[in-house]
From Swiss-Prot:
<comment type="similarity">
    <text>Belongs to the universal ribosomal protein uL1 family.</text>
</comment>
<comment type="function">
    <text>Binds directly to 23S rRNA. The L1 stalk is quite mobile in the ribosome, and is involved in E site tRNA release.</text>
</comment>
<dbReference type="GO" id="GO:0006412">
    <property type="term" value="P:translation"/>
</dbReference>
<keyword id="KW-0810">Translation regulation</keyword>
<keyword id="KW-0694">RNA-binding</keyword>
<keyword id="KW-0678">Repressor</keyword>
<dbReference type="InterPro" id="IPR023673">
    <property type="entry name" value="Ribosomal_uL1_CS"/>
</dbReference>
<dbReference type="GO" id="GO:0000049">
    <property type="term" value="F:tRNA binding"/>
</dbReference>
<dbReference type="GO" id="GO:0003735">
    <property type="term" value="F:structural constituent of ribosome"/>
</dbReference>
<keyword id="KW-0687">Ribonucleoprotein</keyword>
<dbReference type="InterPro" id="IPR023674">
    <property type="entry name" value="Ribosomal_uL1-like"/>
</dbReference>
<keyword id="KW-0820">tRNA-binding</keyword>
<comment type="function">
    <text>Protein L1 is also a translational repressor protein, it controls the translation of the L11 operon by binding to its mRNA.</text>
</comment>
<dbReference type="GO" id="GO:0006417">
    <property type="term" value="P:regulation of translation"/>
</dbReference>
<dbReference type="InterPro" id="IPR028364">
    <property type="entry name" value="Ribosomal_uL1/biogenesis"/>
</dbReference>
<dbReference type="InterPro" id="IPR002143">
    <property type="entry name" value="Ribosomal_uL1"/>
</dbReference>
<protein>
    <recommendedName>
        <fullName>Large ribosomal subunit protein uL1</fullName>
    </recommendedName>
</protein>
Length: 237
């Protein structure tokens, strides 16, 4: 049985109208109605008109948040030789080769937020699919996490690069900052994400691509947002 929302949540929800807000209106609203005592993450959720069971309708990609995410991500680099030194100098939190692969395999260790691997290590890293895959941590060339330029990849992740991927129900969930950020910074970050998702529309997708979108804080109610302006901008490019 679903738990009944608390009084604070219900009070916040009453301040949200049943309409689609412009993003510039929605962000100040979720800041106004917040009630949690901690610095919540602000998230965007987008329901897409795709069927992710078909490979040609998979939507995934990365976007660099112009204002970061308010949290320093822990980065693991799996590499060999000089690339290990390069990774350490670039600020990776954990660096290793086969030793790291063995640790993850034997301990199901996942105390990090992102994994970067050099191409020569992917034969070994491929064994880690059962541990890394379900957590969205598997390195992938499409997201820039399988690369020889480990320093650049580390810098981008530390600066706030977000990977997005549609789930099996056709929804993308992604963080765009902290509730303590200014409204302008959150609008800029959320705009970057929405634009990137629209740009990643599969060629075979038919009908309305973005079916609905909401923005919310960790504990707060969702506020529906109008993504039409972003689609218009994308079409004009």
């Amino acid at each position: 049985m679903a738990r009944k929302p608390g009084k604070q949540y219900q009070a916040a929800q009453k301040q949200v109208e049943s309409k689609e807000y412009q993003l510039e209106e929605a962000i100040p609203l979720i800041k106004k109605i917040k009630f949690a005592k901690f610095d919540e993450t602000v998230e965007v959720h987008m329901r897409l008109g795709v069927d992710p069971k078909h490979a040609d309708q998979m939507v995934r990609g990365t976007v660099l948040m112009p204002n970061g995410l308010g949290k320093s991500k822990k980065v693991l680099v799996i590499a060999s030789g000089d690339k290990q030194r390069e990774a350490t100098e670039a600020g990776a939190d954990f660096v290793g080769g086969e030793d790291m692969v063995n640790k993850i395999q034997s301990e199901s260790w996942t105390d990090y937020d992102a994994v970067i691997a050099t191409p020569d290590m992917m034969r070994s890293v491929g064994k880690l699919g059962k541990v890394l895959g379900p957590r969205g941590l598997m390195p992938n060339p499409k997201t820039g996490t399988v690369t020889v330029d480990v320093a650049k990849a580390i810098a981008e992740i530390k600066a706030g690069k977000v990977e997005f991927r549609v789930d099996k129900t056709g929804i993308i969930h992604a963080p765009v900052g902290k509730i303590s950020f200014s409204a302008d910074k959150l609008v800029e970050n959320a705009s970057s994400l929405i634009a990137a998702v629209i740009k990643a529309k599969p060629a075979v997708a038919k009908g309305k691509y973005v079916r609905s979108a909401t923005v919310c804080s960790t504990m707060g109610p969702g506020v529906a947002i109008d993504t039409a302006p972003f689609s218009v901008k994308a079409a004009a490019v």
